A protein has these predicted regions:
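Accessory terminal and edge-of-domain segments that mediate assembly/interaction
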Residues: 1-145, 153-218
């Protein structure tokens, strides 16, 4: 069911109706429910991946504060294990801190807006195979963007601890993608995404452009 998306299906007469066939979509929707512990209807188009619980904790803390803010577009937080948080929920962070999410291989949290333009965070755990699996299944939802957040494992001489490192390369020694994308084909960075993250860093930090360039590395 991935032939169209992988660019290996070349129709002679009829064009496909979508990127994935119906069986592939149904299978992936079921897998998303299983892996993340949340309804597929709650997934938002802006997806973050992480494998560190501290990023989950910060996302939950910030999400709960947004739900309580009357000027915020966010109306609810859907959490792995069937937990649903709104402005009326008492002690929301305590409700989320139970162990329900640990029952799922790649638990998810969805910060939902009324128009469905919110943010989803998925804790993908450790390993490139997990990352590929969740991306394969999320692809049927056609999200606007997905980003991996984590921390850098090494520093150049020009970098210092605390710098924001925007990764734009992938060392393919894990061979996870070899079957669909041979290693001799490079995976380029997306300039539009890099520029958007740079502009967002400048806006949130309040630092002038030259100072941001000293702290943000690619």
């Amino acid at each position: 069911g991935d032939e169209t998306a992988d660019g290996i299906f070349h129709p002679a007469e009829f064009s496909p109706l979508s990127h994935f066939d119906a069986r592939r979509v149904d299978f992936s929707l079921a897998r998303l429910r299983h892996y993340t512990g949340t309804p597929v209807e709650h997934f938002q188009p802006f997806v973050l991946f992480t494998n560190y619980t501290r990023y989950v904790d910060e996302f939950v803390r910030w999400g709960c504060s947004q739900i309580l803010d009357p000027d915020s577009p966010y109306i609810a937080l859907s959490c792995a294990g069937g937990i649903w948080i709104t402005a009326e929920t008492e002690a929301p962070e305590e409700a989320i801190s139970d162990l329900a999410w640990k029952k799922h291989q790649m638990p998810a949290w969805h910060l939902i807006t009324a128009d469905g333009q919110g943010i989803t965070l998925v804790n993908i755990g450790v390993g490139p195979s997990n990352a590929k699996t969740i991306c394969d299944h999320l692809a049927v939802l056609r999200p606007d963007v997905w980003l991996m957040i984590g921390h850098c494992g090494g520093l150049r001489e020009s970098q210092a601890i605390g710098d924001y490192v925007l990764a734009h390369a992938y060392l393919r020694d894990d061979h996870v993608l070899d079957a669909v994308l041979p290693p001799d084909i490079p995976i380029p960075s997306i300039a539009e995404v890099q520029r958007a993250l740079y502009d967002a860093t400048k806006e949130v930090s309040g630092m002038p452009g030259e100072e941001v360039k000293q702290r943000l590395r690619t």
